[in-house]
């Protein structure tokens, strides 16, 4: 080590000091210029789309307002996908090495079919990245303070004012602005299949994962009502493929008493009953809802149903419902905080948006109940709080 140190300190017998300085300058310039040029070249749109796996998304981008618009300002690939700050840019470049690996070595996205299969995963990763830095790339062009709301569409102005007040991340509301949105339903439908396959109906308290017909007697052909998703029942008896159950819920005393709800005054549906099941209900208690001055009765109904689509823990149902919410309501805009609406308010809100989704009736019912059970006036009830709303 001493010899090496002495050699480094000793003047060169072969090279002049000027030559050594010149070499040092050249090396220094190279260390500065080459990475800069490399980053600049690999950040061009031409470089990005040179991989054939990027051609489909490039064609999508060409149809967007970021490619062609009235003002003639074009956002290139790097404008959206590479953070403007140096640490963020370097980090993104290092992460991009995985794209090269997946394309040329793992071959996981090297065909249109493979790319589509991973589109949701790739999109969610990019959304999370943009959410993490508060859409820094978007803000390099767009600024809340620079917006003239008078020149915006009234609805756009209203939404942007709310977003500006909360300093909301752009990606919360503008997913799919430049590329086709992935089909998020594959994720939550796979999750439901796994929930159904792993259903455990042991125990005295069960929860429904689907809309299930209920019967007045074991073996009946005609149903006497329906048990709705995410509803709790008590098992009274097991007989082969049949379960005798006890359903408890609230109904308006002056009404037809065919629908049971989770709480008095809140349209969180548990079950519908009719025929002999309805005729044999017991009234447990009554209460008056102050807001509407209406009397509600707590009823207890006994019925039979076939085994299947029941679980002994509500938490997996809520986890699935959360995927439903994020997989559908985040598609067109930023999903609002669930507690932004009360339980009854969520009915109209969801009805106004459901036409833009591909949810079936079971999914719609499950999602609505999840939202209602976590609403502003019921928050926490979805996680095991049994207290009744009076």
UniProtKB/Swiss-Prot annotation:
Gene3D superfamilies: Di-heme elbow motif domain. GO terms for cellular component: Gram-negative-bacterium-type cell wall; plasma membrane. It is found in: Cell inner membrane. Heme 3 binds at residues 138, 141-142. InterPro entries: Cytochrome_c-type_ET, Membr-bd_4haem_cyt_TorC, Multihaem_cyt_sf, NapC/NirT_cyt_c_N, NapC/NirT_cytc_sf. The N-terminal domain interacts with TorA. The immature C-terminal domain can bind to the N-terminal detector region of TorS. This is Cytochrome c-type protein TorC. The gene is torC.
